[in-house]
From Swiss-Prot:
Residues 16-94 form the GIY-YIG domain. GO terms for cellular component: cytoplasm; excinuclease repair complex. This is UvrABC system protein C. The keyword DNA damage applies.
Amino acid sequence: MSEIFDAKAFLKTVTSQPGVYRMYDAGGTVIYVGKAKDLKKRLSSYFRSNLASRKTEALVAQIQHIDVTVTHTETEALLLEHNYIKLYQPRYNVLLRDDKSYPFIFLSGDTHPRLAMHRGAKHAKGEYFGPFPNGYAVRETLALLQKIFPIRQCENSVYRNRSRPCLQYQIGRCLGPCVAGLVSEEEYAQQVEYVRLFLSGKDDQVLTQLIARMEKASQDLAFEEAARIRDQIQAVRRVTERQFVSNAGDDLDVIGVAFDAGMACVHVLFIRQGKVLGSRSYFPKVPGGTELGEVVETFVGQFYLQGSQMRTLPGEILLDFNLSDKTLLADSLSELAGRRIHVQTKPRGDRARYLKLARTNAATALITKLSQQSTITQRLTALAAVLKLPAIKRMECFDISHTMGEQTVASCVVFDANGPLRAEYRRYNIAGITPGDDYAAMNQVLRRRYGKAIEESKIPDVILIDGGKGQLAQAKAVFAELDVPWDKHHPLLLGVAKGADRKAGLETLFFEPEGEGFSLPPDSPALHVIQHIRDESHDHAIGGHRKKRAKVKNTSTLETIEGVGPKRRQMLLKYMGGLQGLRNASVEEIAKVPGISQGLAEKIFWSLKH
């Protein structure tokens, strides 16, 4: 029992109603959140002499204070518990690391509907199909749909400003509804209906309608039309032949679990209309001593009861582990969805086959993850030995990217004991410096990153500075001047200079800006982890710089031409079919645009050419 917490006095004040409790340590940090049907009974169990696990013993030893929130029902307690877990991220709770909303395919409600990927709240008028496991699955499906059913995927701003068709029309990936006369309203509406049926899992209806149209076209001697429809039929069949489809045609999520060496993998199959849309593996953060039942129960609750997950509920959830609160979970999900949600643990037939697939995928993903973690752990241990540190729990690396001093972007990437922590990667737009001054850029990003209060768990053990002695000197100067509440001497600053011809394995490392550096053998695990984080930082910086450069390039060209305001820009883009069409136009063609004189056309022409 905690020596700094009077459990007896506290328990006298606790009610026997349902609710949620939050446990705090001496620093005022929430270390655990839990729910209970009977708060008094549940909280009393923490302060018995014979505790169930070492994890609970370690938790209780750190309790300084407990807050209790009483709720009307168990369902309210369950929802509030997961909201608090998401808010506080307590270290003794099982935590779902990835809380992104899932993407959908969106079919807009416009006169000429468009297909697009959508995340977040569903405010726009139209139909939503999904969810898909990730953005890649959506983009792959959109590319496939574009080949089979050529309806538009362009933004409305582009669609409304076209006077001639784009490249997608030329290569047969769009029917060109933006230009009058290219496609009839009936034909476009028919293709949209095919997409709607296809995404709803009604492939047979699509094929039946296409075959009927092909036969009619043949009877009418419209052989080119019949051949085009035949190609559509073949494309649809090729897609459906590759897909295992359940005869039931239901919407369900299938959750398989694997647990080994203190690490858990939860694999989710997303099945809609009987089709597997995709799958995804999750590796929740599991405190030591946690039982598998708690991992599954907490994961399922967080997965469906936090934020956007509530809008993607299927009709049925299959689990390969029996939950103690299965009925409570099903009732809570049903209440949220406004319809009955079933939670099953012993399926048969196709459902059993799906569950076996999810379980196998979870086991395979866990084996791969453990292997990767073993490699990362070995590398971090080797680097800690080289740097004479007891351990490395967190590393951060910085890099600068620009083109001739323009659009400068700094990147910060983060590694923890499991490798890249991509959710904490950051980019910083650098401004107010002399173009091309990498030292000033590094100085600015380090001040912005570290010149403020930082949680103790997020103070890095090692900070890598990509660039060698000069950049390391800037980092040392920044840290010498910092006035912060955390120990600014704790992070070890390490400069990394690229080798001759930037060849991997020839890097030189520096502890101090003055004096000689040192190198590690090319086969050193310590060097490999340095190369890994350095390359991640480099790629992250370049990616941000390219996006910034592309944005400037695409928006500033016309804006810099004197005499071309917003209305003339819009008119030019509309009549020329976009910026590329305008670049390819002659002076005479530009002069034909309403409101553009011969002199202004020449100015526009030469500005775009040079």
